[in-house]
């Protein structure tokens, strides 16, 4: 699995086996970001259930200004941090361009961010999807994680 476009194109992403972790394929990310086009430029990304970080890292590689990654599994988040370091180095981005939050997504969404995000990736594990779906969207809206021009992508 690799970054499919932008400054870090071709950089490999590591993965760790964990229940429910199914990284987005390179082909799917490439199609998605091709359809988004320049809308990713200078955006603030929120990558929920980040896993390997492939969505947020793809966005950073393609010109997003910042990505916040939320992953509750500590072991998975360690691999995520390694992936972030590799992409930031390859794309010549500062470490401040990425932030990792090791926390349950629903608990995080009870807070209110300093600023809303322009691009939100929502890719929960399949086994949690039915339990989370309504709560996730409600909290994203209620607690101002999004604004009227935000783009929310749910897989």
Set out the residue ranges of the language-model regions:
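Class I S-adenosyl-L-methionine-dependent methyltransferase catalytic core
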Residues: 1-155
């Amino acid at each position: 699995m690799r970054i499919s476009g932008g400054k870090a194109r071709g950089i490999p992403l590591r993965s760790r086996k964990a229940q429910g972790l199914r990284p987005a394929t390179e082909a799917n990310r490439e199609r998605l970001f091709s359809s988004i086009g320049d809308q990713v430029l200078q955006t603030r990304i929120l990558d929920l259930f980040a896993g390997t970080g492939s969505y947020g890292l793809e966005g950073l590689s393609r010109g997003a200004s910042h990505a916040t990654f939320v992953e509750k599994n500590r072991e998975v988040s360690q691999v995520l941090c390694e992936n972030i370091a590799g992409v930031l180095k390859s794309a010549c981005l500062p470490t401040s361009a990425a932030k990792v939050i090791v926390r349950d997504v629903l608990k995080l969404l009870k807070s209110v961010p300093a600023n809303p995000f322009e691009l939100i990736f929502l890719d929960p594990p399949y086994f949690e999807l039915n339990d989370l779906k309504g709560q996730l969207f409600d909290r994203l809206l209620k607690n101002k994680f999004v604004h009227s021009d935000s783009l929310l992508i749910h897989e």
